[in-house]
């Protein structure tokens, strides 16, 4: 018989991980406070998502947000949770949320040096049918000495200090990067803590899955149509790619990270600038995918190189395994050359 205990006595929790990263960077502790506050909000949202049906949180709150999406009751709750937790961390100065038309400026007595862009509940159109949804965030340093304003959030993704997403699925998971790879943490409901389950996850060089909304095939540009045709009917006799699309970006991106392949929300005739928002949807997931060895592009440039012009700016997004994204870009270049 073994005398090994069934309980882990030296587990790496996300709280401990964040503190260790801060110590290694010889930081002030402000980013540690910020990340821990974000994690508290994520735990609270996870709890609300699990209780939503019983607590009458499904359904529409009776309004439309700034980007034209119907606002769900859980959206409103999640947004308030994140804003309140971040402002009470004393580490933020500007908050940009999908749910707020303008940036939220933290009160002077609570201000810190960080800017946070977030989508409190991504994929909320899937709430009522219990499909996976998530929270996405990116953290930047304020780069000027001026009074905090919306302009402080208009930084390219290359300036990100830390980014991540939470996925509320069969379990609650957080993918987090502070610029040194991507680590995955799962919420242990017994402990109420996120525990490290995978360190330095790497995306496959090439996958076997493509993910996009083929319902919009009527509006696809020539490059997208050509690429999808190649995946479904390979000319080299290889097996076709599998098609997977949840319609909740966090779920689709996380599957792409874990299994490899490509996720696409390209520009089309209906949405010539793309549909996903740069600051709080595209940049955080592009950062995670690049940190894991993948690629993320708008079709014309890396997502993280885009210089934002407005806080709710939309861009096309194609990300995933480097060889798959490169093949898509080859289709784009070929079609541009043929014009």
UniProtKB/Swiss-Prot annotation:
The protein's enzyme class: hydrolase
Residue ranges of the motif Nuclear localization signal: 204-208
Main location: other
InterPro entries linked: FBPase_C_dom (IPR044015), FBPase_class-1 (IPR000146), FBPase_N (IPR033391), FBPtase (IPR028343), Fructose_bisphosphatase_AS (IPR020548)
Site feature location: Important for the conversion from active R-state to inactive T-state in the presence of AMP: 33
Cofactor: Mg(2+)
SUPFAM superfamilies: Carbohydrate phosphatase
Regulation: Subject to complex allosteric regulation. The enzyme can assume an active R-state, or an inactive T-state. Intermediate conformations may exist. AMP acts as an allosteric inhibitor. Fructose 2,6-bisphosphate acts as a competitive inhibitor. Strongly inhibited by Ca(2+).
Residues where substrate binds: 122, 213-216, 245-249, 265, 275
Cited function: Catalyzes the hydrolysis of fructose 1,6-bisphosphate to fructose 6-phosphate in the presence of divalent cations and probably participates in glycogen synthesis from carbohydrate precursors, such as lactate.
Record's protein name: Fructose-1,6-bisphosphatase isozyme 2
Organism: Rattus norvegicus (Rat)
Gene: Fbp2
